[in-house]
Amino acid sequence: MSCSNNTEPTRIAILGTDNIVVDHGIWLNWVTKDLFDNVKSSTYVLVTDTNLYDTYVPPFKHAFDGATDTTAGPRLLTLAIPPGEISKSRQSKAHIEDWMLSQQCTRDTVIIALGGGVIGDMLGYVAATFMRGIRFVQVPTTLLAMVDSSIGGKTAIDTPMGKNLVGAFWQPSRIYIDLAFLETLPSREFINGMAEVIKTAAIWDENEFATLEANAPSIVAAVNQPTGPGRLSPIREILKRIVLGSARVKAEVVSSDEREGGLRNLLNFGHSIGHAYEALLTPQLLHGEAVAIGMVKEAELARYLGVLRPSAVARLAKCISSYGLPTSLGDKRVIKLTAGKRCPVDILLQKMAVDKKNDGRKKKIVLLSAIGKTHEPRATTVEDAAIKVMLSASTLITPGVSTKLATTVTPPGSKSISNRALILAALGEGTCRIKNLLHSDDVEFMLTAITRLGGASYAWEDAGEVLVLTGKGGQLRASSDPLYLGNAGTASRFLTTVVALCSPADVSSTVLTGNARMQVRPIGPLVDALRSNGVSIDYLGPGKSLPLRIDAAGGFAGGVIELAATVSSQYVSSILMAAPYAKEPVTLRLVGGKPISQPYIDMTLAMMKTFGVQVERSSSDPNTYHIAKGTYKNPAEYTIESDASSATYPLAIAAITGTTCTVPNIGSSSLQGDARFAIDVLQPMGCTVQQTASSTTVTGPAPGGLLGLPHVDMEPMTDAFLTASVLAAVAAGTTKISGIANQRVKECNRIAAMREQLGKFGIATDEFDDGIIVTGQPLDTLKTPDAGVFCYDDHRVAMSFSVLSTVANAPVTILERECTGKTWPGWWDTLSQSFGLRLNGDDKHPGVEGRHQQDHTTRSVFIVGMRGAGKTTTGRWMAKLLKRPFIDLDEELERRSGMTIPEMIHGTKGWEGFRRDELQLLHDVMENQASGHVFSCGGGIVESPEARKLLIAYKEKGGCVLLVHRDTKQVVDYLLQDKTRPAYREDIEDVYYRRKPLYDECSNFQYFSPHPAASVASRDAPLDFRCFVDAICGDGSKVTKMTAKEQSFFVSLTVPSVDSAVDVIPQVVVGSDAVELRVDLLQDQTPESVARQVSALRSAAGMPIIFTLRTVSQGGCFPDADHTQALSLYILALRMGVEFIDLEMTWPEHILQTVTNLKGRSRIIASHHDPRGELSWKNGSWTPFYNRALQWGSVIKLVGTAQSMEDNYDLARFKSDMLASHPTPVIALNMGALGKLSRVLNGFLTPVSHPALPFKAAPGQLSAAEIRRALFLLGNINAQSFHLFGKPISKSRSPALHNSLFNLTGLPHKYGLVETDQADEVAAVIREPDFGGASVTIPLKLDVMPLLDEVSESAKVIGAVNTIIPMPLDGSQKRRLLGDNTDWRGMVHCLESIGVASESTASTTTASALVIGSGGTTRAAIFALKSHGYHPIYMLARNEQSLETIRASFPTDFDLRALGGPAEVFTLAVAPTVVISTIPADKPMDPSLRETLEVVLKSPVSEQRTRVLLEMAYQPRHTAAMRLAEDAGWRTIPGAEVLAAQGWHQFQMWTGITPRFIDAQAAVNGDEIPTSTD
């Protein structure tokens, strides 16, 4: 870095001395000499951070040494400290002081603080206290430090209680501002500093502010170039000017008020609120970003208090946003950076309470009175209530307007006229001074857009009240960046035609886009008209809405243009205004019926005339217009009328409250149709109206005296219908409003919105094709909306309901307060100042209004894929799992057409006709059966481009299009054998590979079936498919439950192939909550192979999957540079619905963004690993990685390397601090043997290994069992006691079962026997502190029920409890005891494990079952069979009365029937295929039962089914009933297996851990099982 010229740098005086030095390149060849000449010392101590040291310290040391003549010259000591706010601490200060003392520094030492604000603040405080004060110099390297923190002598360190709370005023001897440092400053840091530059101009110098406005594009363009020498050369002079200007302001203020007595407080403009935001959002939000938001909020506060005009607020906000700084918490960048963290208003006020400007409890805030001027020469005292209104998301309106009120309200400029004026002036030639321009979001979007198109230049005059716009006569250039228009419908429609006038520049087209609502608002008729006139326009979204790509062809052709104008008059105005610049004269013909909102078309014609273009209206057809070629001539001055739609709100308040309001600048001569509202609506409702050509005054009747309107046509003023509706709500009678059909496609469906929100007030409404009907209620019957009024982000909804709130019976909350900024940013100020209403801030945030939101979880599913891939099978599975009807579209097409598909193809229709009918059917079901169904499509559906468009649009709108595939060779083999469908006309494999990209394009999910076609046709959905459907369509409860656990684990699968490890996977996943597939360790990483591995893993593990590609640099095996393969594998994982994606934060931005955009229901684990141990948890070096992970992740994973045990404690402190700041879950670990403690203490989703795996995924990894044992030793897991209650129980195998499983999973619990038949003995045990759960057997299964707090539904129906589970209450330490029954679960498990499928929908015929016995276990068996879909269920017992008692106690839908004897068996319509015996087996079976059972067992069945007898007695192991069944060819299940199964379920309920069932079986049978998983 060197000086570019030999001139002396510029100096700025501060406190009477020229101590601030500013120029380019002074660090190396000027600072050393100045130090030696003017800041002499024997020792200079240069301190900087580790990021800057290597770049800037060695060359300075070289220059320093070169300037020292003798060995006796001064010495230079250098020190590097960690970067970031964490270094601004007592510990860092002590470290520096101790080091300086060790270097024998004395009182003549000079500290050189090289760095940003952290370095300057902290080193200044060191200088202030070292040896009672030594000299120091500031060398700021960031723009923020150059213009702010380095100037003024404020020094400080942070404490745990807050920032800058301990420090001193200590002036630097020199401040060297070398602008060359900014060449390497990252763009975000540079822009961060611009906030302080804007601040000083805003409070002190309007001229400098104007300079900042004018130079924003060039400054931002330069800053966004890659860092390095010459980057800022294009802005060299302006950069120096703005830094000098800002530094001079601060120096002048400090010189007048060094110790912050009053004037210096002005430098805190934006900081009172900004610091509060920063306190909650740091470190993710930078200081300048927080201050930028704070400036806007404090300016809005000044406007609310009546000391600042709205135009100044708008001007400030636009200047801030023009530099890329945020202006609200709703800014997309802020949401992304902070992970959407909320800032509760009460917490913000608490943070503001410790502001040093405050006077005791009185908060003081710097208020602007104009740009460049403050309200007072100090901070102003402001009440908390006013601050809360500005900070809150919603406004609480307390009703009560003085009945004597007579007020005058001037609404802002008309949005409609403002937008038209900007278009006309930009297309025109010359300069136009535009007065009363609306300062709102919509108009700002328009102004920004025409500037970006090069259509005009502009400046502000009269403190922002006048826009001076110079048009360029229609010379527009295409924009390389998309023009974002938010929810500005007017701007989007006008600009669609204007952009068609652009000529190519660096690009040959321009993209118009907007927010989510704008992307569903219609624009099709306008696009159709322009397309027909030769303009190339592409829809970039699924519907006929924005975003649009519009070709830059230098204008449209002209001639005759036909346009449908029944939806929006803005389509007409858009073409009219651009028509003079068409290549030929234009004849615009409006077709399709009566144009909507004719007054707005007339407004456009009148304004065009003012700007020099006369449109000729056809004498023969009033809906045809002739526009000659021409150029607009800008008038010298144009005044925007106030907005007539907005004027309806203050006039309506007068009407509803019985007061008087005058709008002084809207009258009968207005261009706007809504100006008729007072005469056409308010006067017939009973108001007194006085209207002149230029003003309107309304006086309302006494409150409650408004009259309903039997019918009013509001087509000329459709936007005003919302105002009329709220008045009608309290008017006598019923009001019918028509002519407003277009209001369904505005910012929201306004008719539906008004009906829903009026309903909250108890108002009855109805609607018809083009209107709404409102039945009024007396004022005293109005209800108060408990959850507030939801505004749909629609300004007119918010303002209308604020009118109704003025006469409510209790305060009303209007949600989404800031949406009024679209047309009247100061509306709430007007309510307070002009109408005297008491407003309060309400921190309510709107929830989702379900009726107007598409519930994607209920959307129909469309399945695509090759014939033979399993579409029909998986469709039936999915329909069963989701409880939806399934429709095979091939079969449906055959049904509707009355012919088979081969008949269609080989008949007159042919392939073309078949595809046409297939497409028509797809369109029909998408339109009419869009929710609650599962459809499978024909394999060739993707051959049709139109069908592909439908499928793509469906998935892009949130629908599920599922691609089903299995091994390609299996599909081919199947198709070669299938003769039921038309043969392919080409090679089957060629067909598949041609269609594969089409299937991928049309689908957003894919299921790879690992099961051969023959093995699944008649089965229940396999485990892998059930997991898949739960992941993509389920309620997410499985993952939510997992992540809510106090201790959760995932096992890292380190195998080269899942297929080769399927036998060991069930063992290694025990005790874990998820399984990590290390894709980088797989031998075959091709997409099809990985898809097969994912499906195989789901089958083997049955739990959520973490999909991980660990790169070489982060300790894995995947190549760091293979971005293409990485992205393709991530996309595959997302399409397969994996529950978690481990996404390394070192991937390029495009990978992170793509994965985030496509993630759907998958959760991102944003990870960073440091295998080389280069980062420290102690010094803040992990903070940037945490911040980056916070932007992208649902979970954050940070893995370091432990060099000492202390590293684990540092990690724990870091994690605690981060979790205190943000709720995003954090996995934070240290690798290595010394890091094991961090794994034990991690808690959330700890990665674990297992001895059965070939190797550990990371050094120091432990098993889940080892971690649980360690947690027990540390006291984090308490040993609990589990019991079996009953009598006799001495021979029970339950203790063996549960104690084996406790040991296996590393839990310290014990299970023992409590032999009793007395319920009161049980009552004492189950309330003991260490009680963990219990099993209950006879005779207590019924007796324990009154002792419990809750009993499950299944236990209630069965009438018996065999399991007691302690359930912690939310937010309470008191436990509730739940009684459940696992006997039936054990039975179901045993049946399923032997291959008995659920009968609920598995077959088209019914399947029956038989239960033998009449005791308590009989009831559990009946419940098990019912849950498995069997009906009827027959019962067989000796005592017929007992059977009748049982039958009567169950609901009738159980379909229970007593079986009388052998003869009755022959009369059964459906013979049982499952028998459950619940009678004792240690005694001979009753002969009559035996005879009947033998007949049942030998009865033939109509379908080929697995026939099973389940024995509930486990002594002896092989019973008489089992022998009978086996002799008849039935399969049998011994009772010991059911005992193991019900106990296995009990263990899961108690611990949340699912062990292997074979381990439970082994324990019950007394077989040897592993005693440990270590």
Curated annotation (Swiss-Prot):
InterPro entries: 3-dehydroquinate_DH_AS (IPR018508), Aldolase_TIM (IPR013785), Aminoacid_DH-like_N_sf (IPR046346), DHQ_synth_AroB (IPR016037), DHQS/DOIS_N (IPR030960), DHQS_C (IPR056179), DHquinase_I (IPR001381), Enolpyruvate_Tfrase_dom (IPR001986). Residues 858-1052 are annotated as: Shikimate kinase. It catalyses: 7-phospho-2-dehydro-3-deoxy-D-arabino-heptonate = 3-dehydroquinate + phosphate; 3-dehydroquinate = 3-dehydroshikimate + H2O; shikimate + NADP(+) = 3-dehydroshikimate + NADPH + H(+); shikimate + ATP = 3-phosphoshikimate + ADP + H(+). Pathway: Metabolic intermediate biosynthesis; chorismate biosynthesis; chorismate from D-erythrose 4-phosphate and phosphoenolpyruvate: step 2/7; Metabolic intermediate biosynthesis; chorismate biosynthesis; chorismate from D-erythrose 4-phosphate and phosphoenolpyruvate: step 3/7; Metabolic intermediate biosynthesis; chorismate biosynthesis; chorismate from D-erythrose 4-phosphate and phosphoenolpyruvate: step 4/7; Metabolic intermediate biosynthesis; chorismate biosynthesis; chorismate from D-erythrose 4-phosphate and phosphoenolpyruvate: step 5/7. 7-phospho-2-dehydro-3-deoxy-D-arabino-heptonate binds at residues 132, 148, 154, 164, 196-199, 250, 264-268, 271, 287, 356. Disulfide bonds: none annotated. GO terms for biological process: amino acid biosynthetic process; aromatic amino acid family biosynthetic process; chorismate biosynthetic process. It comes from the Eukaryota. GO terms for molecular function: 3-dehydroquinate dehydratase activity; 3-dehydroquinate synthase activity; 3-phosphoshikimate 1-carboxyvinyltransferase activity; ATP binding; metal ion binding; shikimate 3-dehydrogenase (NADP+) activity; shikimate kinase activity. GO terms for cellular component: cytoplasm. The keyword NADP applies. Zn(2+) binds at residues 196, 271, 287. ATP binds at residues 865-872. The active site is at residues 260, 275, 819, 1169, 1197. Binds 2 Zn(2+) ions per subunit. Residues 1279-1574 are annotated as: Shikimate dehydrogenase. Residues 1-384 are annotated as: 3-dehydroquinate synthase. Its main location: cytoplasm. Its cofactor is Zn(2+). Homodimer. This is Pentafunctional AROM polypeptide. It comes from Verticillium alfalfae (strain VaMs.102 / ATCC MYA-4576 / FGSC 10136) (Verticillium wilt of alfalfa).
